[in-house]
Amino acid sequence: MKQYFSFQWHITDDCDQRCKHCYIFSENTCKHLDSMSWERMQETFYNCLDFCEVHNRLPYFYITGGDPILHPDFWQLLGLLKQYGIPFTILGNPFHLNDAVCQRLKNYGCEKYQLSIDGLRETHDWFRKPGSFDTTLEKIGCINRAGIRSVVMTTVSGKNIDEVPGIIDAVVAAGANVFAFARYCPTSEEKDTGIEPLRYRQLLADCDKKFKEYEAAGCTTYFNKKDHLWTLYEYETGTFKIPEGIEDGMIYGGCNCGNCHLTILPTGDVYACRRVQNSKVANVFEDRLADVWVCQMEQYRDYTRFEKCSKCELLAFCRGCPAVASGKTGNFYATDPQCWKEVK
């Protein structure tokens, strides 16, 4: 059976918000806003299909921006995806959603729509813009009514870590189908997320307790434990056990960079991971993605180079978040700054 390969495709930088932690403007607040032309979008699409044909994968697209719905050819692109029967998720804003728009998305084959909540009302609106918090929670209902799975993602940093339990309550009350959080990735060397390792472990413990309480009460929200440090936490608490008979040198879980995804920006630049700022490997208008995968991407598959993880029994299952490590040090294989495990 073929496995899916995901393309996170940023079709435009256009957006109704200017979030303080946005990667688009992280190093250049006066950056020109790029958008991919319809001709280039078709070229990109067929390059991705060629990749999947060569490597025997099924394509899956995460269409994003900016806010992708602002692209003048957004609906035309969805028509192309529908023509080929390819499933997709939208990562976008809430501001242009209503029942009719969400139903139209569903008709084109949209499976999930991901929104962001990055704090309780005051903090979230400070990150994004006034009114964003309430609008985001309100639009969860539009997404659900259309039969699309509503996903809420939180980016955790020192600014909002204390609010995460409250965010979970708000998201559950709004009826979100899925909730997940990941850590903010510093966007140039020596920046820090401002979270001590044991403080982050405590967040996982607090959330684990809350998730279990909601699940026991029949809550329908699925809590996606996205951060790979959950594996370490569950290993310590006995929920996760290393299976017997595992193959030496085989990777069974953890970060998927170099395994099953690529990121494409509006300029055509291809990144191993959007959150790793120095991970540009190609340009989709100039390079064949199928070749990039077995050439330039090899540098992200040398698991023996992980400075700390290579000495840990969880290497094949965890590896933390290399993007966070890279954001702090510039080194993809450096120690995850929030990993609390002592490894000798």
Model region roles, listed by residue range:
Residues 41, 200-203, 289:
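Hydrophobic/aromatic residues in well-formed alpha-helices
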Residues 25, 64, 116, 182, ...:
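Conserved residues at the C-terminal ends of beta-strands
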Residues 66-68, 94-95, 119, 252, ...:
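Active-site metal-binding loops of divalent metal-dependent hydrolases
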Residues 10, 31-32, 36, 108-112, ...:
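Radical SAM enzyme [4Fe-4S]-AdoMet core and its adjacent flexible, acidic
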Residues 1-111:
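Conserved alpha-helical substructure of the radical SAM core
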Residues 2-3, 25, 29, 270-344:
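Flexible mid-to-C-terminal extensions adjoining Fe-S/redox cofactors in radical SAM and related proteins
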Residues 18, 57, 109, 175-177, ...:
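Short loop/turn motifs at secondary-structure junctions
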Residues 27, 96, 120, 158, ...:
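Positions that flank functional sites
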